[in-house]
Regions:
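Conserved ABC transporter NBD signature motif
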Residues: 13-20, 30
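Conserved coupling/switch loops of ABC nucleotide-binding domains, chiefly the family-specific signature
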Residues: 11-14, 167
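ABC-family ATPase nucleotide-binding domain "signature/switch" substructure
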Residues: 2-7, 31-43, 48-51, 65-71, ...
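Conserved A-loop
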Residues: 7-8, 17
Length: 224
């Protein structure tokens, strides 16, 4: 992904986009054309409004709100003391992982690009939150191109083309059904991850001991 964003130049070969060598484009033009959501979200000591519109500084408050709604961020922002004028602590301390992720996605939606790169962007989230966010991503970006880097295969099951990499090399390619039929590396990883997920779902919830209530000599209740 860093090569696509021109943070580095390829040491060998070239990267073509729509038949044109990426090296022919300026760094700024490439980064303006791509919406990038990384694994580690960078939030600044500014208002939520400013943190979202950093991808497009001319955006109005209404446009920022619309992007936040698409990212399922508007509701939690609306319940903050100053809503979009709430000032964030350094690195977004005080927000949950899911809330940070929604702000990052709102940035991407506000940018309104033709190509979105999601680089392990939900790997720090729990399964339920990740599923919710990806369902929203697929709904909002159905008519855009997406490049998704992920280790949790459930998040890329519906992709048109899946490239399986091992030690830096592509070892398999195809959609989910094709790769499962090959019964290769992808199928092995899929079955392993699904087995872990089923095991977690079947594990009983931890038992919480019942409270014991007694009264002391003064008639006051004591809970153990």
């Amino acid at each position: 992904t860093k090569l696509l964003l021109k943070y580095y130049d390829p040491e060998d070969g070239e990267i073509d986009i729509n038949g044109a060598n990426l090296a022919e484009y300026t760094n700024s033009s490439v980064r303006r054309a791509i919406a990038y959501v990384p694994q580690n979200i960078e939030l600044f000591s500014k208002t939520i409004y400013d943190n979202i519109r950093i991808s497009r500084m001319d955006a109005t408050l209404d446009e920022v709100k619309e992007a936040a709604k698409k990212a399922d961020a508007h509701e939690f922002i609306r319940h903050l003391p100053l809503q979009y004028n709430t000032y964030l602590e350094e690195a977004g301390n005080g927000l949950s992982g899911g809330e940070k992720q929604r702000i990052a996605l709102a940035r991407a939606f506000l940018k309104d690009s033709n190509l979105y790169i999601l680089d392990e962007s939900t790997s720090n989230l729990d399964f339920a939150t990740e599923t919710l966010i990806f369902n929203m991503i697929y709904e909002q970006l159905a008519d855009r191109s997406m490049l998704i880097v992920a280790h949790r295969l459930s998040t890329i099951r519906d992709c048109d083309l899946i490239l399986v990499m091992d030690h830096g090399k592509i070892v398999e390619r195809g959609n989910h059904e094709e790769l499962m039929a090959k019964n290769g590396r992808y199928a092995e990883l899929w079955n392993m991850q699904q087995g872990i997920f089923r095991k977690r779902k079947s594990e009983p919830a931890p038992q919480v001991p019942s409270a014991v209530v007694e009264e002391d000599d003064d008639g006051e209740s004591i809970t153990y």
